[in-house]
Amino acid sequence: MEKILTVQELNEALKTLIENKQEFKDIYVQGELSNLTFNKSGHIYFSIKEQDAAINCMMWKTNAYKIQSLNLEDGMQIICYGRLTYYIPTGRVSFEVRDIQIHGIGDLQKIFEQRYKELEQKGWFDPNLKKSIPEFVKNVGIITADSGAAIYDLIRTVHRRLPLINIYLFPAQVQGDKAEIDITNKIKQANNFKIDLDVLIVGRGGGSYEDLWAFNELEVLQAIKNSHIPIISAVGHEPDWVLSDYVADIRAATPTAAGELVSKSIIEIKNQLKHYYQNYKTLILNKLDFFNEKINNYKKDQTKYIKDNFSFKYLQLKQLSIDNTKWTKNKIDSVIYKLEDYKHSINNSIIHIINSQNKALKNYLIADEQKILNYLKKQISEFNYTISSFKGHINQILKYEELSFDTLENKLNSLDPLKPLQNGYSIVTNLNHQKIRSYKQVKLNEDLKVILTDSKLTVTIKEVKTNEQ
C-alpha cells in the first residue's frame, strides 16, 4: 500500500525541497510591481506579476533601507534579488526579497558611481570651492519647471517668511530628452541677467530615478561649477541624492527647504539688528572709556613730571646758593686778614656779586618753570579739544544709527499683517483659511474663523445684511 502523507509532512517536505534547492537560493526575478504595502512594523509586502503569473513577495525591515531612494510605485518594472521560501501553516510559496532595482536603472547607477568618483578626484566637491550665501538675500533666481507644486511651495515659503525678497523665475525643462541642455542654458542666462542675483535655486520636485537624471549630466554640473552666483541644489525629496547636490554650494533636501535657506523671517532680522546695535554701542562706549583712562593717565604723568623736575631744579639752585655762599665767605675772610684797610670796599663788592648771582639764578628758574607750564597747558588744551571733537563725532554716529534703526523698525512693523489687529480690527476666514472680503463669499449657517489680536473665534453666519440695507 502506498504511503499516505499528512498535510504537515507534505508541507515540511515541500519546504525542504524548495528552500534547500540551490537554484532557488540566489535568484533574480523581473516583473511588474503590484499591491505595494509598507507595514507599520517596517516590513514591505508586494507582488510581482506579468500577464499570466504572479508571486507574493516580502522584504524585511533589515533590508528596507536599500530602496528608500527608489520611490517605488505600483506598475513599475522591477528586478528583485532574493530566495524562495515556503510557509508551512498556509502552504504558500513566497519570494523573500533582499534587494530591488528598477528595470533599466542598473546601467544608470553604474554611470552615477563612475562619474561621482571622477568628479571627486578632480576636486569638484572640494568644500573650499563652495561660495557662501549672503546673510541678507534680496534677489533670488529659481530654475525649475514653471508649473507643479514645487515652484508654488517654494515661492509661497519665501514670501511668507520675507515678502521683501524679489524672485526671478527661469522656467526650464527638468526631465526628459534635452532637459540637461535647457537647465544648463538657464544657469548661464541667470549668470548674465541684468539684475545681480544673490543666490540661484536649481531643482525640481520628486520623481523616479530616471526623472531626476538630468541633474546628473555633465553639462548641468559644469554650469553649476562655473556659476559666479552661489547655487542651492534642491532636487526631489530628502532621500534623493543627485550629483548636482555635491557640486552645488549648498544642498537642500527639497525646494521648500531651499526657500527657507534663502529667506530669514522678519522677526529674525529685527532681533539680529538689535543685536548688532547693542554690540556696536558697547564697542563705542568701551572705546570712550579706554580713551578717557588714557587721558587721565597722561595728565597724571605730566603733573608728576613737572613736580619732580621743579623739585630737582629747586634743590640744584639751593645747593648752588649754599656752595657760593661758603666760597664767598672764605674769600672775604682771607681778604679781611690780608687787606683790612679795604674791608668796606671789598665787602660791598661781594654783596653786589651775591645779589647779582641770586637774581640771575632766580630769573633762570622762573623762565624755565614758565616755559614748561606753558608747554603743558598747550598740550592739555589741544588734547582736550581732540577728545571733545571725538566725543561729538561719536554722539553723531550713535544718533544716526539710532534714527536708522528706528526707521527700519517702523518699516518692518508696517509690513506685519497682524499689526492692524492691535487697533481693534480682525481677520475673517473660512475653514479653508481663505480671507472673507465680501458677503458673497459666505452662506447662512456657514462656520467662519475670526482672528483677533489675542485669540481666534469660530462663529456661525445667522444673518447677512449689506451696508446699504
From Swiss-Prot:
InterPro entries per UniProt: Exonuc_VII_L, Exonuc_VII_lsu_C, OB-fold_nuc-bd_dom
PANTHER family recorded: EXODEOXYRIBONUCLEASE 7 LARGE SUBUNIT
Keywords for the protein's UniProt record, in alphabetical order: Cytoplasm, Exonuclease, Hydrolase, Nuclease
GO cellular component entries: cytoplasm; exodeoxyribonuclease VII complex
Entry coiled-coil feature ranges: none
Protein name: Exodeoxyribonuclease 7 large subunit
Quaternary data: Heterooligomer composed of large and small subunits.
Family to which this protein belongs: Belongs to the XseA family.
EC number: 3.1.11.6
Subcellular location as annotated: Cytoplasm
Function: Bidirectionally degrades single-stranded DNA into large acid-insoluble oligonucleotides, which are then degraded further into small acid-soluble oligonucleotides.
Gene designation: xseA
Chemical reaction(s) catalysed: Exonucleolytic cleavage in either 5'- to 3'- or 3'- to 5'-direction to yield nucleoside 5'-phosphates
Top-level taxonomic group: Bacteria
